Amino acid sequence: MQLGWKHFKEEEEDHVLVPLSRGGGSRPVKLPLSTNKDELMKTCKGLLFPDGKSIFGKEEEMTFHLANFKNEKIEVTVNVDGNELPFNINNYIDAHKVKNVRIYLLSQKPF
């Protein structure tokens, strides 16, 4: 799967991709299909905020969400064929009918 990072830019009023040169980029990772939302968030923060820091500031100064390839926030459940199931990578694949998973860490500093 691929992990990416989008940080909120006030002037764009949207989350914008962070390039590799600024600590983002598209990062290939191997995770168990049973990985849940909290575990995935922890992996993203560890990868993109080494030592709790980034080019945009400290981890504790920001709010975070996970988003799918359509920029929709990932919730604790996912709809698979009309059934609400707990989010994990396997259920996400089933819900979106994708083979190559791409998930984004969304970060924002409070105003």
Feature annotation, model-predicted:
Residues 1-111:
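Phospho-regulated scaffold assembly regions enriched in serine/threonine/proline and acidic residues
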